[in-house]
Amino acid sequence: MTIKPVSQERLPELLRTIPKAELHIHIEGSLEPELMFALAQRNGVSIPYPDVASLRAAYVFDNLQSFLDIYHAGTLVLRTEQDFYDMTHAYLARAAADNVLHAEIFFDPQTHTAHGVSADVVINGLYRACVDARVEFDMNASLILCFLRHLSEQEAFECLEQALPHLDKLVGVGLASSEMGHPPEKFARVFARARELGLRLVAHAGEEGPPAYIWSALDVLKVERIDHGVQAVQDPLLMARLARDRIALTVCPLSNLKLRVFPTLAAHNLGRLLEAGIVATVNSDDPSYFGGYINQNFTQTFAALGLTAQHAYQLAHNSFEASFIDDRLKRQYFDRLAGVFETFE
């Protein structure tokens, strides 16, 4: 579809208006300090910050591991099914306001089972919020269980076993947490089992890790989509493979900036990925920690890189193409997207 030009003044409004899917959102990373405090009080959990302001000030980190440390500390307040419902509902309300029509939500049950919270409690709370979003926000949402790669293969198998009663509530599995020193092939057998169970497969690769991790995720884990993947540009053969096979990258620009994957947003390679014909998408990753939900990722990245309305259409189209929804719903979303561009002035 050829897109008519939109002025720089009107472009932010277009970016806010376009329908889109979000495919890389860790629900625990959407926990805002205000809700964290409320849940801590509700559950009698002590947190080492006297007020919301001091907690916000603690959201300062310069690499993936230091972020993960505060991220996991924040999850201690999540104890009941209602807590997980409230957190997910808050994200879905915010996403709906950003014109997200479909979200595929990551969650990591191992974080919570380590705190004595059962996988049943986690999944039921998340799923109930997704079901309610269909009526309340006219929004589709599904769940992707993420294994934590710094833990063992055996622990990942145990996590999958605990989720078996809830397979109907899950669309897929993923692989998250600190990448360095934890190559994808560590989890080859777990992903093979998940595939046998009919789950879709994705994995974080090539965020801080090398292009070799992306190759492994594709060829050993057999994933259908790569989360992050920005290091692919180091490998021309990999770039060609991603473009040829329409393998999507769920890119998270503000996350990359916050974790210093790129020194500035202007140095980000999103534009280069699109020019190479790769199915790149824009996502928020852990929005409460990285300073931006999906529309802030769009508006700030477009401003920094000088991207255009044509790029906006391509990224939104890519997000629906790369999603795990059925073809009928994809066509509906493609039509809605085209309609916005046809009528936007």
Swiss-Prot record:
Feature type site, description Important for catalytic activity: 228
Pfam families attached to this UniProt entry: A_deaminase
Active site: 207 (proton donor)
Chain sites annotated for binding Zn(2+): 24, 26, 204, 285
Entry keyword annotation includes Nucleotidyltransferase: no
NCBIfam families noted in UniProt: aden_deam, PRK09358.1-6
Annotated protein name in UniProt: Adenine deaminase
Organism: Albidiferax ferrireducens (strain ATCC BAA-621 / DSM 15236 / T118)
